[in-house]
């Protein structure tokens, strides 16, 4: 680094040209915006982030989802016969909900694996198995290691993450961004609900390639479009929720 310029070299002192990735985040996104803490702000951002998660991804005419970032041909998607979700913490719980949706709607068996345990077994990857790595940051160490183990065994690995240009986004064969914006609060809120929304889209896409009718696909799209508004209505009951919390927050059990 000099006063006028900078250069990047490898460990062997070979100069390289960096790939510059522009991040579409503004300063407002990392400020509390009048809320007492980031967690509350991020809870109230959910109607907006849920809309962002489905923006441009719903195809009402065909009753399906549009997820070109998966980088898979129609035939590849049609021949998926097993899905593995690799995740940790909150992302693992999102995977559990995704498991229910995909198995019920698309009839594809799904396994949700703790990433920290997956690579210490001898996981069996067969033809037709697709692995999804789910991580808000895209940098979760255990998920990255498990994902690389799956790739080593020949799996097609896709990512579901939030941070553009993160390690998972770069190292996977394709994927879907959740578009939740920066999440500062330690307890995940908007990233979790956006992950579930994206998993709903994946479920819809796979189901329409199998046994879900056009009519049912359009119904699902209508329900997905209504979710942000319903979340908004629930958040408007903040004062009622506070009153109930005041009644019960000192209780030891229910």
Question: Where are the language model's segments positioned?
Answer:
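Glycine-rich phosphate/diphosphate-binding loops and the adjacent beta-loop-alpha structural elements
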Residues: 37-39, 81-89, 249-254
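Short gly/ser/thr-rich secondary-structure transition/capping motifs
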Residues: 63-69, 111-117, 157-158, 236-239
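Generic recognition of flexible, low-complexity loop/linker segments
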Residues: 39, 69-74, 87, 120-122, ...
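Accessory alpha-helical/coil subdomains and C-terminal extensions
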Residues: 226-243
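Glycine-rich phosphate/diphosphate-binding loops that line cofactor/substrate pockets in enzymes
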Residues: 53, 65-82, 124-126, 243-252
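Conserved phosphate/anionic-ligand binding catalytic regions in large, soluble enzymes, centered on
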Residues: 35-39, 49-50, 89-98
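Terminal amphipathic helices with adjacent charged low-complexity linkers/tails
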Residues: 2-48, 55-60, 64-66, 174-178, ...
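Glycine-rich phosphate-binding loops that contact phosphosugars or nucleotide phosphates
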Residues: 78-212, 218, 222-226
